[in-house]
Amino acid sequence: MSSEDYGYDYDLLFKIVLIGDSGVGKSNLLSRFTKNEFNMDSKSTIGVEFATRTLEIDGKRIKAQIWDTAGQERYRAITSAYYRGAVGALIVYDISKSSSYENCNHWLSELRENADDNVAVGLIGNKSDLAHLRAVPTEESKTFAQENQLLFTETSALNSENVDKAFEELINTIYQKVSKHQMDLGDSSANGNANGASAPNGPTISLTPTPNENKKANGNNCC
Ligand SMILES: Nc1nc2c(ncn2[C@@H]2O[C@H](COP(=O)(O)OP(=O)(O)OP(=O)(O)O)[C@@H](O)[C@H]2O)c(=O)[nH]1
């Protein structure tokens, strides 16, 4: 039976989390990728939000469910629930703010402590349109990414530069990990939960499919 027979509109669901300091542009990267929207006056995220976009790889419909939360410490009482079931993460900093880059070490440690060992991770230097205010050299971030086995892209949520590329590279990497895991298991888990990815007609790990595409999950409704 195919997943369509079960009434699902995707074959695999990947939970991806966005992390990074407040104001680096996480919410705008999410809205640019999922809705092609940008908001110059966006307010700090309160609670947790998510939005989805479905892509096709190898003829399979991959639904990326991307979670966004506030970078501010005072809103961050949800850490372990936020990371639970994530198969990918993007650590975002602002290329014009060196403190946001220096804090990437903290975000990487928090991710490693809370997420699955197999989680695929990308580093994003956002606001590349602010080249005249650049405070973080590209080469420095590239080296940091290589040393920590992270994908690396500089993006602009404002003018869309590399936003699709950054998300698609991460989703592709997750997909390769899932495919490899299935091959290692002789494909016996074709509907299964390689690295925590959930398939509609396989066992659901920590994420259940949602009926609505874009949801807000504030406070008690969250996680
Ligand atoms: N120039 C420029 N500004 C951006 C870009 N992305 C986001 N911004 C602006 O940066 C500010 C913060 O953006 P948000 O997307 O709310 O940042 P955030 O990381 O979600 O912030 P928190 O929710 O507080 O964690 C807003 O004024 C955005 O308009 C970008 O690529 N270029």
From Swiss-Prot:
- What regulation of activity is recorded for this protein? Alternates between an inactive form bound to GDP and an active form bound to GTP. Activated by the guanine nucleotide-exchange factor (GEF) TRAPP complex, and inactivated by GTPase-activating protein (GAP) GYP3.
What's any one GO cellular component for it? Golgi membrane
Q: How does it sit in the membrane?
A: Lipid-anchor
GO BP annotation list? autophagy; early endosome to Golgi transport; exocytosis; protein transport; vesicle-mediated transport
Q: What is its main location?
A: Golgi
Please state where this protein is localized. Golgi apparatus membrane
Q: Positions of the region Disordered?
A: 185-223
Q: Which Pfam families match?
A: Ras
Q: Which residues of this UniProt protein bind GTP? A: 20-27, 68-72, 126-129
Q: Where is the composition biased (Low complexity)?
A: 188-203
PROSITE patterns given in the database record: RAB
Q: Which UniProt keywords apply?
A: Acetylation, Autophagy, Golgi apparatus, GTP-binding, Lipoprotein, Membrane, Nucleotide-binding, Prenylation, Protein transport, Transport
Q: Where is the lipid attached (S-geranylgeranyl cysteine)?
A: C222, C223
One example of the protein's molecular function in GO is:
GTPase activity
List all Polar residues biased stretches. 204-223
Q: What else is known?
A: Present with 5955 molecules/cell in log phase SD medium.
Note the subunit structure.
Answer: Interacts with YIF1, YIP1, YIP3, YIP4 and YIP5. Interacts with TRS130.
Q: Which family does it belong to?
A: Belongs to the small GTPase superfamily. Rab family.
Could you tell me what this protein does? Required for protein transport in the secretory pathway. Probably involved in regulation of secretory vesicle formation at the trans-Golgi compartment. Plays a role in autophagy.
Name used for this protein in its record:
GTP-binding protein YPT31/YPT8
